[in-house]
C-alpha cells in the first residue's frame, strides 16, 4: 500500500509542476520550426441569409532565423473572396481585385523585376482551399485577414453556415463569433458538434449536443453564437489543434405565403418559401446506369439508396424503373404504376437482380423514360394524372459510349422528347461521369445536376439528394413584380417549388419607387390554382431595422446591395454556361467582369493582387542569408525554378486546392436547383456588339481617385502602401484600423475598441469587415450596455475621429474614406439595352444559384473615360501546321509552381500586316466579323501535333491612338519553360504597376466554346505533367518530321555508340518540347531518365525474334505492358549480332477499369466493353472511363490510363526502305507517375529506382541500392524527345552490352514471358 501511496503522491506533484510550467501546446520534434499562432478568430455576420465572414490569423516567429508563415483556409465552394490584407513589419498590404489578364501582366512584370509573386486557379469543388505563404523574419509578426461572402442555401428546411476551423495548432486565443439577423424572425437554431469529415451520417441534428464552450444568445430577430475553446478543450479534440468545421443551422419564420420582400436603396430581394402547403403527387421514373463501370461498390451503394428511396414514396405517387447499359430495360413497359406496398416490394426485388455489364447508351435511356411518362399520361384506367408532377431521376457514372454519343444530338433529342414538361434531375456518380453534359441536360429540362462522390457515404448522398426533391409543393410558379424594374422583365417563372427549399429573386426597382407589388400564381395539388398578392414599401434608412437588441442595427441596405451583385454574378455565369453562341457568352462575361470589379469579388474573371515592397523582400532575404552558414548554398531570387518559399527568398504562394477525397472536374459554374423555365436565351442578334463600332472594343479606364490631404486630426486619407507603417488592430466597429508603429496589439493590449455608436469605415469601401478574435467576448450578454463592445454598423462611413477611441492615447489614427473606391477599377462596358431587346425575367434561386433580374444597361460612373483598343486581323495559319486538335489531357494535381497555368500569346498583329481589325472579348477570344458562334482555330491543338507547335515571333501593332495600350490574342497555350514567368498579354488597359507584388489569385480559365466546338475541338491542357522538361524552341526550322527515325540515323538501327556519325541533324531542327521519362525504340534501344536528374541512361538489349518481353509489370497499379520482338536482317559484317524490333505492344489494365489494348503495325484493338478495332490510317479519338486513346497522323497513338499514366506508341515506316529496315513500333512513357514503387519490368523498374551516377575508382558508374556498380561512358545518342520533332544529338550515359544484365539485376530470360 505504501508503494501505491508513493506513486500517487509523485503523480500529484508532477501534475502540479506541469500546470505551473505549462506555457503552451507541446511542440513535437518534427515541428521545431513551426511558428507560434498567437490568435485565430473567425467572425461571420449573416443578414437576411447573406453571410460575410472574416478570418484573422496572427503568427509570430520566435526563432533566430526567418521561417515560412502559412495561412490556409477552406472556403465554401459558392463563396466569393472579397478582401485580403496582410500585415508584416507594421505595414498593412491590401489586396486589390483586377481583371485576371491584367493581374497576370502585373505578375509578369513583378516577377521580371525580381519581386516575389505567385498565382493559382479557382476550381468548383465542394470546398476550396485558399493558401498563401511568406517568409517571416525572426522576431516579427504577420497578420492575415481574409474576407469572403456567400448566400446561404435552404436545404430540407434549414440554412447552414459552415466555418472551417483549422488553425493547425493549439491556440491560446481562439474564437468564433456568428451573428444572424433575420427580419421575419428566427424559428430554430442549432449548433451540432464539430464536423471532422464531410461524410454524411444518419444522426439527426436534434440528437446531438453543441460543442463545449459554445454560447447561444437569442433574440426575436437575432442570434449570436460564440465559441471560445480553451487549450484543454482543443486538446481534447486533437493534440495538434482543431481540424474541423463549425456549423450553425437555423430556419426563419415565414408566415406570409408570398414570402419576405425587402427593398433598400432601389434594390430588392425576395425570399419565397411558403410553409404548410400540402404536397403534390408525382410520377417519377428512376433511370439507373448498369454498365460495366458500375460493377462492384457503386452498384451496391445504388441498390442500398434505391431501397430507402422506394420506401419513402407516398402511396399516391406513381413510379417506374429503367436500367440501361448498351441496352435499355423498362421494369413496367406499360407505364408507371402506383407506389403501393406490394409494388414497392416488387420493385426492390427487381433492383436486387440488376447486374452491371455493357456499355453506356444515355440517349436511348432518356428517350425511354420520356416514352414511359407520356404513355402513363395517356393510358386510361391508371388513375387521373391531373396535378401529378413528372420527374426523371437519372443516375450514371460515365459518358455516352454506345448508340448516339454526340452531345448536341443527345441534348436535342431529349429536349424534344420531354417537351419542357418534365423535370430531369441528373446525378453524376464519380469522377468519370460527363458532368458538363448532365448539367446541360438538366438545365434545359427544368432540373439540376448534382455530383455523387465515390465515398462510403454515397448511398446517403443519393438519399439526401432525393429528399430535396421528394416533396413538390407547387408547379409553374410565376412571380410578377409590379411597380417598375430596371433592365428586366417584370416576372419570373420556376418549374417547381419543393418543400424545404427556397426561391430567391433579386433585382433593381426604378429610382424613387417607394412600393413594389408582387403577384403570385402557381399550380397546387390536383391542378388547383394558387393566387396571392402583396405590396411591399421601400425601407428608409431612418426606420428601425431588425437586429440584436441593445446593439446598432446592421446596415441592411449595404448587405442587400452586395447580395444583389452576388446573385447577379451567379446568374450571369449560369447563363453563360447555357448560352449556345460565342458572342452571347462574351457579352455575358463582360457583365460578370464589370460587377466583379465594382463589388470587389474574386470570380472566374477577376484576380486578387497584393503588392509587397521590394525593400521588405530584400530585408528578409538579407536576414536569412546572414543566418545561413558560410557553406550553405542559397537559391537565387531570380531562379527560374519556381516561386517556392525558402529561407533565402520571401515569397507569397497562394493556392486553391480541393481535397483529394472528393475530386471534381474543374468548372466554376454555379448550379441552381430550379431554373426559370421562361427565361429566353440571348443570341448574337439580340445583343449589341461590344464597343462603338463593329471593329473595335471600347474599354473604359478610370482615373485614380484623388487622395485628400492628411487631416490635422491625424486621420489617414487613404490606406496606401506609401503611408506610415500600420497594423491591424481589433475593433468592434468592424473595421481594420491602421495604427502608427509602436501601437502593436500585443504590445498595447489595453487599447480600447470603439463603442456601439462609433462608425469607422472598413479598409475596403463597400466590404463589411469584422473585428479580430481578441475582441470576441464569450460571456458578453446579448443586451449589452452602451459603450460595450458590440457589432458594427456595417458600411457606414465617417470622417470624424471615433468617439470610442480615447483621444489621449497617442499613435492611434482613424481612417477617412473618399467618396469613390480607393482603387478605381476599369470596367468593360456592357451593351446598352434597346426597347425591342428581350429581357431576361427576374431570376430566382432555389437551393443553389439564384436567378436574378438581368440588366443589359451599363452602369458606368460619370468619371469613366473610354479608350478604344483595336487589333489587327489574326495572321494566316501556317499551311504546314495541321488543324485537327488533340483531346485535352486529364486533370492532374497542379504543382505548386504557377508556370503550369501560364500560356503564350496567340496571334499578335504585325506592324506590316493588314489594317483590318477584329473585335475581342474580355477573355481574350476574338469575335470574328461577322459574329459567328465559333472560336479561331488557334485556340486548339493542331491535327498532326501531339504537342503544341513552336511559338512564332510576332510584333505588336502600335496603339490606334496615343496613350492606348495595345492588345494581343491568346494562342493555343503551350506549356512554358519550367520556372519561367508566363508570357501573357494584357487584355485591358493596365494600371501603373504598384511598388511590389506578392499575391496573385487567378481563377480557372472560363472557356467560351460553343456547343458545337465542345464536341469537335479540345482545348489544350493547362496542367502539364511535372516530369516534362520544357525548353525554348529555336526561331527557325520546320517541325515536319515524318517519324522515320532510321532515315535520320543514316541506317537501320542507328548504332548508339557512333558519336562520330556523319549524319547529323538537319539545319533548323527544333529542340525538344519535353523529355520522355523512359522509352524503347529501334534495335531495341532503351533510354531511361535517371529519377530526380536530367541525366539519361542508354542501352541496347540483345533480344531474340518472337520473344515476348515484359516492359512494365505493376500488380498494385493493375498495369501490364509487354512487347513482342520481330527479327531483322543483321548488318553487314555483324552476322553474329541479332537485330530485333518491336512488332506488337500489348497494354493490359485491370484497375480501375479492365482493358486490353493491342497495338500492332497494322491496327489497334481494344477489348473492354466489347471489342473495337481501329486503323492507323484513320484519325480517331476514343474515350472510356479512365481511358483515352488518340490516333493521329497515321504514326502516333497516345494512350492515357487515368490521370497519372500516359504512354505513346509510334509506328515507324519507310517510304524507300533498305534491306535492313522494317516497319516497327516504339514505346514511350510520357507520364509514369501512376506506377507504384513495386513496378517491375525492363522499363517499369526504373520509374522509382534508387539509382545514382557516381564517380568510382574505375571512372563513372551507376550505383543502385543494394546492387553492384555498373560502368558507363558518356556518349552521344540521337534521342527522340517529341513525336513530331526530329531526333537530336544528346548526351547519354552508355551501358555496354556486356553490362546490361548487371544494370537490370536479372538475366535476360527473366524478362521473357
UniProtKB/Swiss-Prot annotation:
GO biological process, one term: hyaluronan metabolic process
Compositionally biased residues, Low complexity: 907-921
InterPro entries for this protein: ITI_HC_C (IPR010600), ITIH (IPR050934), VIT (IPR013694), VWF_A (IPR002035), vWFA_dom_sf (IPR036465)
Domain of life: Eukaryota
Listed GO MF terms: serine-type endopeptidase inhibitor activity
Region Disordered: start-end pairs: 612-644, 783-817, 856-928, 959-983
Ranges of residues in domain VWFA: 283-469
A Pfam family reported for this protein in Swiss-Prot or TrEMBL: ITI_HC_C
Compositionally biased region (Pro residues): 876-888
Glycosylation sites: 83, 374, 540, 594, 971, 1231
Keywords recorded for this protein, A-Z: Glycoprotein, Protease inhibitor, Secreted, Serine protease inhibitor, Signal
SMART domains: VIT, VWA
Leader peptide range in chain numbering: 1-23
Family: Belongs to the ITIH family.
Name by which UniProt lists this protein: Inter-alpha-trypsin inhibitor heavy chain H6
